[in-house]
Amino acid sequence: MPEQDLSKVRNIGFIAHIDAGKTTVTERVLYFTGETYKIGDIDDGTTVMDFMSLERERGITIGSAATNASWRNHQVNIIDTPGHVDFTAEVQRSLRVLDGGVVVLESVSGVQPQSETVWRQANEYKVPRMIFVNKMDRLGADFYNAVQTVHDRLGANAVPLQIPMGAESSFLGMIDLLERKAFIYESEDAVQHKETDIPDEYKEDVEKYRNELIEKIAETDEALMDKFFDDQELTVEELKKGLRKAVLNLEIFPVLCGSALRHRGVHPLLDAVIDYLPSPIDVPSIKGTNVSDESIEIERKPDASDPFSALVFKVVTDQHVGRLVYLRIYSGVLESGSNVYNSSTRSRERAGRLMKMHADSREEIKEARAGEIVAAIGLKDAITGHTLCDQSNPLLLESINFPDPVLSCLLYTSPSPRDIRRSRMPSSA
């Protein structure tokens, strides 16, 4: 298996308050990238990512689901997370292993209570992210108010990368401020959008918000700032490079807009994911500690030549294959059927089979390399937060710590008639 260019990998998650349209965005991404040929619909219970019967029945995401797609010759590994406050742990475990995030906001309300929670969690793990203001076709949609709520409630430097053309039923598309081009959608089919010159009625707004964007980017880079104050024109490439650097440093959070339900704004969002969110080599190398002495720090680079290290971030039971252990591989190579060292339990385990997950479907692979997110079958003792590594080069990664529960209870199952009959039978001598 040829080694993958890690600069062309994106490990991202979609995070949001409930009903912001996060899963709908993910479904449109899968359709637009050609991973699915039929658009999943929450109301019809046909989504790819919400595959559990209870999720489809209630129309909400309960568990995080992993998938992958390809865009502009880049591999995009995606985790779709729940928006409901009761499933916050699913968001936390996902953010722990992701390199970047897309925060989906609803165009009417902007930042909502759970938006604040997931934003704090992303801050905790220093996850670079961008913002997608969804449902621009909804009654009461207000892009600029949504951006303002990010400033007011999150204290984040949110800067529009696009501005919408219209809102509510008159939402036609969006304008790319850096490129100075408009995307107009004339039908419900996302493929049918067209790039045009900026309509006259938006030219003044474009120059206003473009200048604000340029100034924000220049503030984060001394070389760009010098050119800006010398009244030298900054090229689009210079601005994109500066914006990417600012996003990676958590200095700017670019804002895009669209309507996922009507397929509008998906392809510019994907382009922005590739252009501005980090690859595994753009984020700091993972650091752990010596298994015997926690005061000794060990670093692993995202390279296949480094010793193997991975973190377990989720364990589920599949009705067809049994126990599935989800891993983020930080360094080295994991081969199917190989033995690994669980440094959390000080024991050896065997990764029998490796799977690349697409929601509830699986694609068996022979090996997985640094930067990938996969599932393993055969790991019997590994649980969430455990470190798997090369036994000859062990280390212990920081575990995943969940908030303490506010409620505890015991569940008792009703005994079956067979159990009752057994309890009444006299015991043998």
Predicted regions span which residues?
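Structural and coupling elements of P-loop NTPases
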Residues: M1-S414, R418
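Positively charged, low-complexity/disordered segments
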Residues: S416-D419, S423-A429
